[in-house]
Amino acid sequence: MRALAAVAALLLAVPAAAARPAPPAVFTLKTGASGNPYLPVAVKNATLNIRIALSFDTALILNQAPATRAGLKPFPFLGKRTFKNAMIPGGEATFRFNLASITPAGLPPKKVPAVWVSRAIADDADGILTVGALKADRIDVVMRDTPPGSQTLILKKNGSGETGITTRLGDEEIDISLELNSPTTVMNARAGAALVAAGLARRANAVGYWRPFPGVALPWQRLEPRAGATLLGLPLRQLGSRVSESEARRIAAAARGTSTDSDDADTITVSADRRKKRGREPWILIGRDVLDDCSRISFDRANERWVLTCKFS
């Protein structure tokens, strides 16, 4: 959604507020029963229950009703747009934008781009906020007590406020994110093709569904990882590579989802003449199939890295 990114960039260009007290060195979050961390966040006139995500960039994304309770108003002229995309619940929704001052419980306030959507984007919370928006030098997401024999894995991330990690497979540069809200590891078609070409996985005749938002079911083809295969030191386990509905029907005749063959660039690998790559840049979301073996995941802003404490079975 390039238009959405452009609006967010415009909002971030607003002059910064006066200097505030230094953020804490370490801030700790604990995951709930769903496997995600949550935090009360004051947004204008309301305190909202917000899921803290590991894989978004700096933005607050809200359901419509909580945004109304908070008294948010869209930015003049550019603050309301309708988008169509397979990733959107129902395939189409109205997005409203503005810059909002938020105060997460226990942390200093911060101004972030706020986006509220006419269709529900979270059914377990009022909205979603990236861990990168929390003002602390390090944020520890604690999932359980650390068992004996655990190892520490360090993953360099892209920049100070960013959450993404970049690696290379063959001639593809792949964006990698950690995602506690996904039970499996999901990727787009170009990333899946890169894993297969590198000999790390093979395609299986099975289809599953990625459900990133309520009412969204996007088909993927299962990839079987090679025994012992890893990526950035993380084991490859339950893998799904995005496919179109027509591809899903070919793989499994009973496959049904909410996406269409059009407007779904995550399912495109290479153009018909094989000379020019199409679709979105390759990306992989590392899900709970891997991250459930971690007892602690730390967003280390000061050292621009992720630190994972895990005991892989």
Descriptions of predicted regions:
Residues 5-15:
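Bacterial N-terminal signal peptides
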Residues 18-313:
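Pepsin/retropepsin-fold aspartyl endopeptidases
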